[in-house]
Amino acid sequence: MSLAVRVIPCLDVDAGRVVKGVHFENLRDAGDPVELAAEYYRQGADELTFLDVTASSSHRQTMVDVVSRTAEQIFIPLTVGGGVRTPEDVDSLLRCGADKVGVNTAAINDPTLISRVAERFGNQVLVLSVDARREQGERHTQSGFEVTTMGGRKSTGIDAIWWVKRAQELGAGEILLNSMDADGTQQGFDLEMIKAVRKEVKIPIIASGGAGKASDFPPAIEAGADAVLAASIFHYGKVTIGEVKDAIKAAGYTVR
C-alpha cells in the first residue's frame, strides 16, 4: 500500500456540465465542473477525477476546455476518463492540464492501447478503469468477477481478475476498480472484490462504488485499496472529505 490513503471525488461531466445532482449552498453554479473542482480542492481532496460521460468526439473540445480551466485553479492531480481511444487523445488531455488519463472500453477492445500509452507517456499517467460485477447464476469466469461495459449493462465474458493482471503486465499504472453491484447502493464497497484484485496486482488500487457513509471507507483500505473514490455522497453533502479522512485516520491509516 502507498504511504498515505488518497480520497478522490469523481465528477461526471456531460457536454461541459456536471451530471448527478450536486448540492453545495455556497456555489453560484453547481453544474459547473470548475467550481465544483475548486470546492473539493478547498475541502482537502487529494486528487480529482472527471469522467466525460458524453465522450463523443464532438464534445472532446468541451472537455479539453473544462480540464484546462480546472488545472488553472486546483493544484492536485487531475485524472480524466471517458472516450479515450488513442494515444493522441491522451496527449491532448495531458497538454491541457490532466495529470492522469483513464481508459476503459477502448483498452478492452485493444489491449495494446495500454502498452502504447505507457511507453509514450509513462505508466504513471495511465489509470485502467474496470467496471466489474459478480456473475449471477452460471459462471463464465474463473474468479466469478466479470468485466462489463456500457455502465454495467453489457457483459464481456472477461474475468476481471485476469484483466487487471494483464493490464499490469501491459503497463497500467493504477486500477480504478468500480463495483457495478455496489455502485449507487450506498451500502459499502465490495470488499471481496478489492481483496481478490489486491492478491494479484502490485500497482495501486482505487476503490469505487458503494460508499454511503464515512465508516464505509476504512474497510476498503483494510481490504487492500490505496485510494478511495466516491461521487454522490460528496455531491449531496452527505459526507465531507474531511469526515472521510477523519474516519480513515481513526482506523489507523495515514492521510494527507
From Swiss-Prot:
Quaternary data: Heterodimer of HisH and HisF.
Top-level EC class as recorded in UniProt: lyase
Keyword Cell division applies: no
Catalytic residues in the record: 12, 131
Enzyme Commission identifier(s): 4.3.2.10
Family assignment from sequence similarity: Belongs to the HisA/HisF family.
SUPFAM superfamilies xrefs: Ribulose-phoshate binding barrel
Predominant place of localization: cytoplasm
GO MF term list: imidazoleglycerol-phosphate synthase activity; lyase activity
Pfam family, one: His_biosynth
Sorted UniProt keywords: Amino-acid biosynthesis, Cytoplasm, Histidine biosynthesis, Lyase
Protein name per Swiss-Prot or TrEMBL: Imidazole glycerol phosphate synthase subunit HisF
Keyword Electron transport: no
Cell location: Cytoplasm
Reactions accelerated catalytically: 5-[(5-phospho-1-deoxy-D-ribulos-1-ylimino)methylamino]-1-(5-phospho-beta-D-ribosyl)imidazole-4-carboxamide + L-glutamine = D-erythro-1-(imidazol-4-yl)glycerol 3-phosphate + 5-amino-1-(5-phospho-beta-D-ribosyl)imidazole-4-carboxamide + L-glutamate + H(+)
GO cellular component terms, A-Z: cytoplasm
Protein encoded by which gene: hisF
An annotated GO BP: L-histidine biosynthetic process
